[in-house]
Amino acid sequence: MTAPAADDRIDEIERAITKSRRYQTVAPATVRRLARAALVAARGDVPDAVKRTKRGLHEIYGAFLPPSPPNYAALLRHLDSAVDAGDDEAVRAALLRAMSVHISTRERLPHLDEFYRELFRHLPRPNTLRDLACGLNPLAAPWMGLPAETVYIASDIDARLVGFVDEALTRLNVPHRTNVADLLEDRLDEPADVTLLLKTLPCLETQQRGSGWEVIDIVNSPNIVVTFPTKSLGQRSKGMFQNYSQSFESQARERSCRIQRLEIGNELIYVIQK
């Protein structure tokens, strides 16, 4: 019997992933890229490649969310109640509750006011702000002090999460656009005054070595914010600050980029001017 073609086996892996409640709304481009690499590593063994693909999705996406998909409908109801009541404090409380669902944003919550106050001291007031691999970070818009006319452009690999972000920003009356996008597969040449890449580069490098700076080079934005975690998800430092700072600053020098470095909470921050 002739072995199935690689594309057929990748289709089979993709079908298996879409049956998983945890990963069924991840961008097909992401699933297929990981499936392709997994199939090679598994030497064509589809069941093994499915396991490897899920492992890859966990590393770049699943590890940051609860084991079951968040109840976005309930989170929106809480936000709706606060907005309808006209209670700004209740709105912020609902947003904090929602952001705590995602580990990456949850880690930032104790320092949220300081984070955006200090960050935007080093940035121009943007007409357009793009948030790549955004997670639930767009829900922090009320803390950013953006002009009312600023358009917030948010993208992520998870269609379910992106839909929630779109609904939340609509309720907050934030001008915005959202889309499902994979930074290693989709075009990144839409212009924006400021682009955020918060805790994103380590996930890119996990998938493709050298891809972090490739994305920075391609992004059509004069001001780019890149951040790194200085502790692991288990809250261990593992020399992360030194490793990330040395590597990133070396690459920045090679490109003659102007950078400013900040550290707030467990986050190493670079403001890049291209």
Swiss-Prot record:
InterPro entries: rRNA_MeTrfase, rRNA_MeTrfase_GmN_bac, SAM-dependent_MTases_sf. Changing D182A: Loss of S-adenosyl-L-methionine binding. GO terms for biological process: response to antibiotic. Keywords: Antibiotic resistance, Methyltransferase, rRNA processing, S-adenosyl-L-methionine, Transferase. Pfam families: FmrO (PF07091). Protects M.zionensis, which is an antibiotic-producing bacterium, against self-intoxication. Induction: Regulates its expression by binding to its own mRNA. It comes from Micromonospora zionensis. Its EC number is 2.1.1.179. It catalyses: guanosine(1405) in 16S rRNA + S-adenosyl-L-methionine = N(7)-methylguanosine(1405) in 16S rRNA + S-adenosyl-L-homocysteine. This is 16S rRNA (guanine(1405)-N(7))-methyltransferase. One of its GO terms (molecular function) is rRNA methyltransferase activity. Belongs to the methyltransferase superfamily. Aminoglycoside resistance family. S-adenosyl-L-methionine binds at H102, I103, S104, T105, R106, E107, R108, A133, D156, D182, L183, L198, Q207. Specifically methylates the N(7) position of guanine 1405 in 16S rRNA. Confers resistance to various aminoglycosides, including gentamicin, kanamycin and sisomicin. It comes from the Bacteria.
